[in-house]
Amino acid sequence: YNISVIGGDGTGPEVVDEALKVLEQTKSKFDIDFNFIMNDLGGDRYLKSGDLVTESDIDELGNSDSILLGAIGHPDVKPGILEQGILLKLRKEFDQYINLRPVVLYPGVETPLANKTPKDIDFVVVRENTEGLYAGAGGYIHYGTDKEVATQESINTRSAIERCIEYAFEYTVKNNRKKITPVSYTHLRAHETQF
């Protein structure tokens, strides 16, 4: 398998280094092979060259079987530039529409939640990953004045919501789970409930 590796920023490279060690250990155990293709996307590259994601990056990442990404966000880069220019661009370019987040309490691990055991904390969050506030819609007017206004729009299409819901049901069936709980801020985001 060809895996494009993006260490990124902050603790990202450190986390990715540990993930690569784990993948290396799986090679012989499962008789599989990995070819790691290192990519320098992130804040350091942006500060040096002004590049976020180039067409060459898209081609290289698109030819991989998988992308391993650490973290994006650099203290010397204004918030939003890297996140929109790298994370959101990659999500949209490769249609990575599902954010899948398992939540598991492992045996022997303490939790601040009262009287909870591993059988109580074992669920998966399925979240739409390319729309909503991730659509990147919004802007400023009267920038730098006392009348400055900033907007951030949440764009949600029926098709994106439907495929996210379908994914959740398929995941539930495939993994022998029994329950789906839809979660939304309906009191604040009333129009999203139209779908």
Task: Describe the function of each predicted region.
Residues 1-36:
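N-terminal phosphate-binding or glycine-rich loops at protein starts, especially the Walker A/P-loop
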Residues 2-11, 68-73, 180-185:
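Short glycine-rich or small-residue beta-strand-to-loop segments that form or flank ligand, phosphate
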Residues 9-12, 65, 126, 168:
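Buried hydrophobic positions in well-ordered alpha/beta secondary-structure cores of metabolic enzymes
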Residues 31-37, 175-183:
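Flexible, glycine/charged-enriched surface loops at secondary-structure junctions
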Residues 33-53:
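N-terminal beta-loop-helix "entrance" segment that forms/cooperates
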Residues 47-142, 146-151:
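N-terminal glycine-rich phosphate/adenylate-binding segment common to multiple enzyme folds
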Residues 165, 169-179:
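Glycine-rich phosphate/diphosphate-binding loops that line cofactor/substrate pockets in enzymes
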Residues 186-195:
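Conserved small/polar residues in nucleotide/adenosyl-binding loops
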